[in-house]
Amino acid sequence: RSANEREQLAQDWLALTVERDIHQFTKYKFDSDDALEILNAIAILENPNLANISKKVKVPARRVQSYLKILKMLFVIFEITPSKDSAGKSQFFLIDPILLGHFKASFEKKILTWIYLEMLCQLSYKAKKSNRISFYKTAKSSPVHLMYEADNHIVFAKVCFEQSFDSRDLLIFDSIKKKYKDKKLKLYLFYGGRERFNVDEIQILPWESIV
């Protein structure tokens, strides 16, 4: 599809969502403009949790929470929760990449959303008992963007948004290996380069290898 066609699709879907679909839930008395602003905030915020979305759109958090609940039910957004051992709050993402283009989301947000959607699709396709993915973060570290428990191991994957990386990007994996020393782990770093190799039991892979 051309850029114009993608933009028209985004506008049509947004119009249906904020002007029709959300108003089927009459008890909430939703506002179309607020709904559109919330979707825009989800697209552009680096850390799109409830508090940050509320602050961005200047709508009380409890009210924003109602919008998020219904937008999830309508399959417009999805939620990534922190793991049970992690710091941080749940984050929300748009479920269609076309909307990211419409809202002028950053390159980093597009890459991260695409990776989350790919993993959710793969886990659903493989009919995994648990297709819940989460993120892992300590109070002082940058996040490991993806964590999920498979049948006999735990997967941790960090996304680097550059074509190269350095040792600082790998530091969080040291604490993960210590914390989960009794578990079988699979550790990944996805980056914008082309080469595939291992560093200290961490598989370094290009972004597209997740497909």
Model region roles, listed by residue range:
Residues 185-191:
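Short, hydrophobic beta-strand segments that form beta-sheet elements in well-ordered domains
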Residues 192-211:
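Domain-level recognition of nuclease-like catalytic cores that cleave nucleotide substrates
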Residues 149, 154-165:
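Active-site ExK catalytic segment of metal-dependent nucleases
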Residues 144, 165-167, 195-199:
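Short active-site-adjacent structural elements
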Residues 3-153:
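Accessory nucleic acid-recognition modules appended to NTPase machines
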Residues 163-173:
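Active-site-adjacent loop/helix micro-motif of nuclease/hydrolase catalytic cores
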Residues 124-128, 174-183:
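Arginine/glycine-rich "motif VI" loop of SF2 helicases in the C-terminal RecA-like domain
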